[in-house]
Amino acid sequence: MKTFTYIFKRSLILVVLFCSFTNSNAQTDTTKFIQRIPADTSKQKLNMDAVYNRPFLTAGKLPIAIGGYLEANTQYAQTDGISDGFSFQARRFTLFFSSTIAKKIKFLSELEFEDGTKEINIEFAAMDIEFHPLLNLRGGIVMNPIGAFNQNHDGPIWDFIDRPISALTIIPSTLSNAGFGLHGKYFVKRWILGYEAYLTNGFDDNIISNEDNRTSLAAGKRNPARFEESNSGLPMFTGKLAIRNRKIGELGISYMTGVYNKWKQDGLILDSKRSASVLAVDFNTSLIKNRLNITGEVAKVFVDVPETYTQQFGTQQFGGYMDIVGTVLKREILGWDNAKLNVGVRLEYADYNQGSFKVTGGNIADDIWAIVPSIAFRPVGTTVLRFNYRYEQQRDLLGNPPALTGVIQFGFSTYF
């Protein structure tokens, strides 16, 4: 907690100094001094570019640019007829800091405060050195390039208030670790090919020893010590290939694998090496002159679980989501020149224990699915007002009648 408080204070001081410095020049022409850098939409972009493709604010000759976003909402939820009433949620307040250190050398960090200050995380803090467009070195705290949502998760981008179930529990976004790696892109006419490959610290034994009483990669990432040491003493590998066509869309295939358990300590062998692996496929496309957008992702998890564990802890998991969003109105509204009204729907599913019981042969349940209709108003591209209704069904391990949940949500998200 002391570390989190220290980070918060230093970040706050930096923002205050930035604002004070800009205010001290208020008597001059601030339109020349203060410059807003919008997200770059002029070039073909992949999900791997999302970390830098954000709006920033610079001031004069300061060597740093800042930005961020805020998410807040209210919701009313009811499960099997039981409700705790309305709640207001300040979900995320995120700050970005970027700097060009020298030619072809740059730095970016992302600091996120969740639920007020309940969680404070450095989600990204890395230096990039470009030797060639196909060969860039990145090191520090990096986002593991598994799936697309883990890389492209900023709230203002999405018309849905909740993050996808599979992006929280199957792939535990936002997943970051300390490490190094390479990335690059290659352009050919309308095509762009990108790759990323990193070696980082990985998960720990909490994958199979947690309060959820199931196999959970989300529980395995909660250990803050992963930023200073590897629990297994071995690196975790994450790699991704992505290809994009200007007219068709983007397809990405990614893989992550590593030993998660403490198999050796002080030279003594405690257990065999047990791995956790994830294979993910993501895609996105735009149709009808960008008025219809389809985004999706599926992921399969493989975990080596000790034979002494019961089947409550699954060796395989699967999940995914698909968002279909259409623009039904785009015009000047209340003084906003290019305001948009979108309608959409999200379909999502997660199975935390694929397989059947050894004794009975019956199917193991422990799954959840949901459908989420959405109405979103975008006065400008960086701000969204969202209204969602969420209907979900969740079954326990034995497949008993599912718990039925309905959630009404209204909120906003904006870059600043």
Report residues per predicted region.
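A short, charged helix-loop
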Residues: 195, 199-203, 213-222
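Loop-centered beta-sheet repeat module
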Residues: 214-264
